[in-house]
Amino acid sequence: PLCVCLQLTDRRMNFLARANVFKNPVFNKMLRAMGLLPAYRMGHEGLSAVNKNFETFEDAGNSLRDGETVMLYQEAGHQDKRWLGTFKLGYLRIAFAAAEKMNFEQDIMILPSCNHYSNYFHARTDMVIKFGKPISLKPYYEKYQASQRETMMEINKVVREEIKDMMLHIEDI
């Protein structure tokens, strides 16, 4: 994420990070000041903690509304393979919540990106960052208001295909 952040320097960057690093009140304050927001995961923090994501989504939506960037990876994890994992819908929930707060008057853009590492396990190896074409959510606003989940699933497919086209994707490994 830091390498991508360094490529996008024209605005404040916000990131979602594992919630467990926010447990210490001092670290919590420091991380939030740096633009990190806690992401609660079912497999790690449990169902009751996952509901705290609504506050994170609210904070991320406020950042988007204020013209900042929220960066997250839809796969919500790391892997050392050459294939694209399953995407979660949280990034679209954040984006549409921000659009809703702005009465669907401002456009929210999704910028697909992918990272290629020459050696996933070793730092200081070659890395390539690719950015795709920004995807505007504005054409989907009306459809979203009528059918939220179906619209998010449709956009998720578009974003996933855009990222898949930018990377080395080998499904049968």
Language-model features and meaning:
Residues P1-E150:
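Soluble catalytic domains of membrane acyltransferases
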Residues R149-M153, K157-I173:
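Long, charge-rich alpha-helical interaction segments
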